[in-house]
């Protein structure tokens, strides 16, 4: 089970006790926000994009953010193309709805969008479509082994 793999991975950071599992789906931002009891913007959604270099990249962003094609192209040099559900599972080891930056192969680069920085804590998935993990942005950056903070989103508001 993917959530067990994530729990074991987060143990090395002392964060395994932050995982919450639910009896209801957390596969969408709205479902996760309801289950966790926070505004949707605090859900850190993980999107999987095609990469000619390594097959896949992960970008985590606030639940209210949307990818800005121009910003994405400026950052990565290509138009953003989401992976299929099958490819997302193949590259990350997590099924869509539970995709997260934890316990993914080292070859998969992870980036964090600045839309997350306005919150003290955020809630990415933890490997299943019925889980979440509460992390500060610093903890998320460290545990995801992020390659850094980027600005590729639009539609979010700084003061939420």
Locate the predicted segments by residue:
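Extended, low-hydrophobicity, polar/charged segments
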Residues: 1-160
């Amino acid at each position: 089970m993917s959530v067990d793999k994530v729990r074991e991975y987060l143990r090395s950071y002392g964060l395994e006790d932050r995982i919450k599992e639910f009896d209801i789906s957390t596969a969408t931002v709205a479902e996760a926000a309801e289950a966790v009891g926070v505004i949707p913007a605090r859900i850190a959604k993980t999107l999987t994009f095609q990469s000619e270099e390594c097959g896949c990249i992960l970008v985590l962003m606030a639940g209210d953010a949307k990818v800005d094609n121009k910003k994405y192209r400026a950052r990565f040099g290509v138009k953003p193309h989401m992976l299929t559900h099958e490819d997302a599972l193949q590259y990350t080891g997590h099924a869509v709805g539970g995709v997260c930056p934890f316990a993914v192969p080292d070859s998969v680069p992870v980036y964090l969008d600045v839309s997350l920085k306005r919150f003290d804590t955020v809630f990415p998935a933890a490997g299943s479509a019925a889980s979440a993990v509460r992390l500060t942005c610093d903890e998320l950056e460290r545990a995801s082994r992020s390659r850094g903070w980027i600005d590729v989103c639009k539609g979010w508001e700084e003061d939420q």
